[in-house]
Amino acid sequence: MSRRPQPGVLAVIAMAGALGASAVAGATTVPDPGECAGTIRFGAAVSETGRYEREGKDTREGYQLWENWVNDEYGGIKVGEECFNAEVVYYDDESDADRVANLTERLITEDEVDFLLGPYASDLTMGASAIAEQHGVIMVEGNGASEAIFERGFKNIFGVLTPGGDYTRSALEALSAAGAETVVIAYEDAAFPTSVAEGAERWAEEFGMEVLATESYPEGVTDVSAIMTNFRDLDPDVFIGGGHFNDALLFIRGAEELGFQPGAMIITVGPSNPEFVAELGDSANGVIGPTQWEREMTWEDEYFGTAEEYAARYEEAYGREPTYQAAESTATALTLQIAIEQSGSIETDAVRQALLDMDVVTFYGPINFDETGKNAAKPMGFIQIQDGEIRLVGPAEVADAELQYPLGE
């Protein structure tokens, strides 16, 4: 049964929006949920099982943290002078592109959600956002970094994260300055890793580095030894691996078994997750990982406070440190909330325009969308695992440790 606002509620929203009323964070009195004018429903198909289940868990927890905060502490979403409860409807997409498309259709047509929060992974976001576009429903996402998502002329997809093509930019610039000259790239043949690899080739050339080889591999592989053997024989300064968490483990274990020891290893997704260090132990030391967010970063907002304060809140709720996937998921929902509040409406056209006009800084970083829906304002950071600790080494203005290069020296 749908809980979306009824016609009378929509009239209240429209009238309040016309009056230009707005709300700010920090209300001294949090209304009882029953005192709000209605409920705004958000739909989220996330990976609770399958190959993306680790990242999917982080995604769901990020959404849940926002949902609990906005209802229990913030006092509901402020639309004009009224408050509205937030409800997120979840389904397990099983890390499957066909299933996420079907579930997105279900969320729109059966559950009658008002807005959509994106799934984890670019390939799933591609399909889900296509269904959203067909129905004219806004989707804000924080876990699909492939530029291809935003190159289809869609009006209703907005991504808060730094695009995949820029994942390695900061790290390659720093490594080039440290003397690295040659690069090899391995990537999974899927939307996000392809975007990372194409960007890495572009930025390596920009920084005067030679790409010795680029090789792709199919989704779901369990052995990358052939690629790593070829790369070992090329003796590059830098190895770049584009994939997801399990791929990151394969790269490190494969390199170790084959005696492949480049001066630096940049690997997406895995290294910034404490579970990566826990699984690999000392083998993780020295690995560099692009990161969308870390608790040491200096961004803050009036909602969750500083990045550190957000991290502490997450730890209290879930008993572990937040990954950047969790943080960007919370930021996704927060961004949609801000757009609703700034527009004074839940009507699609008004909220879409508020997203296009948005220029804010959150605990996760700056949010400013270009005409395609990409966040054009947010830089990418990078970490390095040093003595078993995840240390922020770039960009330099927010780093808490110095880059170690080359490894073994």
Region spans (language model):
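Beta-alpha junction/loop-to-helix N-cap segments that form part of ligand/metal-binding clefts
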Residues: 29-35, 54-61, 73-154, 160, ...
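Extracytoplasmic "Venus flytrap"
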Residues: 30-39, 43-66, 91-97, 120-123, ...
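Short, low-complexity disordered leader/linker segments with a strong preference
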Residues: 1-41, 404, 408-409
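Hydrophobic alpha-helical
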Residues: 122-129, 236-258, 332
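Extracellular/periplasmic periplasmic-binding protein-like sensory domains
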Residues: 255-330, 390, 396-408
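Extracytoplasmic ligand/sensor domains, especially the bilobed periplasmic-binding protein
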Residues: 98, 110-215, 264-289
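Segments of small-molecule ligand-sensing domains
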Residues: 313-326, 335-393
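Short, solvent-exposed loop/beta-turn-alpha elements that line the ligand-binding surface or hinge
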Residues: 74-81, 298-301, 367-368, 387
